[in-house]
């Protein structure tokens, strides 16, 4: 299954390269890493909430308790639409967690390999600067849940008298989560409180990455575990660029972590080979496992 996904992605990249160069002028930060001052308890809590999106519906019922959070709403099936769960959390407020790729779903897999950069969706395009491009497949996946997600956020913010909104995602769900976080920030009252994204691939071009920094840079938390290969795709040679700052857990699945400032920092994850497997991508993030369909169901926080 992993080989099939890599082959599909390679074919997509080859098609893009044959279409001509995109943007090779994005910069790379040379700043040295700094000590981790991010809230690891919140990272652990967020990891548990996103793990539950991979669990069977029989274990995903409103009222389910995961750490300090209570499940209020769920939508999507992981096939034609990625699943998202909405929780009320003591630490995170209204927390929306978005599922990553379902390896048994062709539709889900195809979202990962539709690599052409496209304009932002018409519903939110006017909020972005001219020249913004995002990956087709990631945006397609987000748009399929967008209306249900926005309605649910607005409903439960009102019901719970809660202004804080936190967007969480893993893998494909992290890419969708970045688009969702920007959408909520740009179009909804109060915007987002934070976004926690695990194993985030590149989502857009340098214009997009710079706009993310401008709008939510102080609320953006990207976490990379060990030798995870997913944050290396789609490649920069195709015009894609990460926003600034990530937390790198190294060795993988440990609690040793540093923050790497700026966009595409030349230190950190770029200095080690990528592992051609999912062990670090589906790893342990500050004592909480994101194991996808092989992970704990119901999800547990802080027990690894």
Swiss-Prot record:
The keyword Lipid metabolism applies. Optimum temperature is 34 degrees Celsius. Residues 1-19 form the signal peptide. Glycans are attached at residues 102, 253. Its main location: secreted. Its EC number is 3.1.1.-. It catalyses: a monoacylglycerol + H2O = glycerol + a fatty acid + H(+); a diacylglycerol + H2O = a monoacylglycerol + a fatty acid + H(+). Optimum pH is 5.0. The active site is at 171 (nucleophile), 228, 281. Secreted lipase involved in Dandruff and seborrheic dermatitis (D/SD) probably via lipase-mediated breakdown of sebaceous lipids and release of irritating free fatty acids. Shows activity against monoglyceride and diglyceride substrates and generates free oleic acid from the substrates mono- and diolein. Able to cleave the oleic acid from both the 1 and the 2 position of the glycerol backbone as 1,2 isomers of diolein were converted into oleic acid and glycerol. Can hydrolyze 4-nitrophenyl palmitate to release 4-nitrophenol and palmitoic acid. This is Secreted mono- and diacylglycerol lipase LIP1.
């Amino acid at each position: 299954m992993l080989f099939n996904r890599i082959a599909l992605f390679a074919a997509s990249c080859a098609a893009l390269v044959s279409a001509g160069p995109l943007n090779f002028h994005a910069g790379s930060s040379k700043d040295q890493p700094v000590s981790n001052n991010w809230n690891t308890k919140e990272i652990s809590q967020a990891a548990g909430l996103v793990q539950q999106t991979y669990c069977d519906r029989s274990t995903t019922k409103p009222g389910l308790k995961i750490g300090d959070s209570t499940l209020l709403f769920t939508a999507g099936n992981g096939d034609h639409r990625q699943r998202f769960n909405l929780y009320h959390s003591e630490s995170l407020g209204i927390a929306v967690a978005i599922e990553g790729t379902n390896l048994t779903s062709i539709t889900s897999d195809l979202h990962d390999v539709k690599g052409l950069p496209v304009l932002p969706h018409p519903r939110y395009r006017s909020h972005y600067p001219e020249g913004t491009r995002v990956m087709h497949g990631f945006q397609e996946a987000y748009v399929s849940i967008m209306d249900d997600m926005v309605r649910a956020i607005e409903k439960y913010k009102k019901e719970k008298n809660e202004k804080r909104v936190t967007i969480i995602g893993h893998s494909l769900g992290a890419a969708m989560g970045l688009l969702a976080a920007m959408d909520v920030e740009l179009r909804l009252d109060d915007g987002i409180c934070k976004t926690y994204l695990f194993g985030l691939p590149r989502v857009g071009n340098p214009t997009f990455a710079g706009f993310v920094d401008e709008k939510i840079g102080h609320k953006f938390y990207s976490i990379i575990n060990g030798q995870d290969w997913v944050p290396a795709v789609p490649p920069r040679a195709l015009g894609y660029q990460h926003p600034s700052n990530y937390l790198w857990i190294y060795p993988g699945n440990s609690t040793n972590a540093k923050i790497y400032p700026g966009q595409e920092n030349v230190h950190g994850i770029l200095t080690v080979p990528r592992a051609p497997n999912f062990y670090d991508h589906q790893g342990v993030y500050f004592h909480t496992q994101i194991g996808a369909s092989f992970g704990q169901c119901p999800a547990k926080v802080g027990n690894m």
